[in-house]
Amino acid sequence: MKETKATEKNSVPKNVTGKQNPVVQFIRENLGITVGLIVLCLILVIYDITQGRTVFLTTNNIMNVLRQVATNLIIACGMTMVIILGGIDLSVGSIVGFSGCVTAMLIAYSHWPLAAAVSAGILMGVLSGAFNGLVISKTTIPPFIVTLAMMNIARGAAYVYTGAQPIRIMSDSFNFIGSGYIANVIPVPVVYLIIIVIVSSFIMNRTRLGRHIYAVGGNPTAAKFSGIKNGRVLFFAYLFSGIMSAISGVVLASRMFSGQPTAGQGFELDAIAAVVLGGTSMLGGVGKIGGTVIGALIIGVLNNGLNLLNINSFWQYIVKGIVILIAVYADFLKKKNRKI
């Protein structure tokens, strides 16, 4: 009997009792999208080779991709929390435009100090996100309808506030936020992005709030019976999404040297695509910020690759739509196989 127990003890794999390497674990959990990103990069490298000149692998192009990815991924960090809860936020693109316009107007015409103007722009995201979270958590109105309403409200407010005209910003200190470089190499938006990704990952993986988000997204009824305040969790997620959208809006306005009421159109599509490609389930309860990072990189490299290949920009919408459909269908098949 003792010999049997000893044999069973020795037969336990080390990776069951020991802590698995987080990098290896991440790659295993996101194998499909990791391979997809690698294949996409290889295609562009092969394109460089066949053309006899380096286009994709230049430092300037890679930094440009990271700068563009930063705008989308900042939004996608908030969208990840919302989708893990089984919700959706269609207002993110409009909040991007409205926040950028408010910041631009206050700097260009009201001559507010930079910090105050940026804070006011981000405040627009706080108010918009709080509205979404409050209505969704206190009523039975679906998130799709609530955020669709906010999408129109924020976009309309941007047009009214600016008179439907771009607001030019002649401020080097403001333009540095979205167009500057650290040590003449790293784009400033990438620094903000790294901080936001770290904070978002910490919230989701190391805090009680993060555990509650997964619990409510997986089974809201069970979460409620276990003592979790579902309404507070929902409110925070939409508030956080609004703040991330506003930050992205300020960064985008800085990068474009202007606040434009049309800015951010279609950004909700890119954010949702990044989240879904990253392995987050549209049904809720499953997802990782790390997966969203890879998803956003795929979207960024895909957009950049299509531009380098001189493919009409309108095709990008078709490609991204197909990519989202495939990702959602793959998630459906994965869940179906698990049930079997």
How should these model regions be labeled?
Residues I33-I46, M79-T80, I122, M151-G156, ...:
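Hydrophobic core segments of alpha-helical transmembrane domains in multi-pass membrane transport
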Residues W112-V118, L127-N132, A183-G259:
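Helix-loop-helix "hairpin" substructures at the membrane interface of multi-pass membrane proteins
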Residues H111-M151, G295:
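Alpha-helical transmembrane segments within multi-pass membrane transporters and channels
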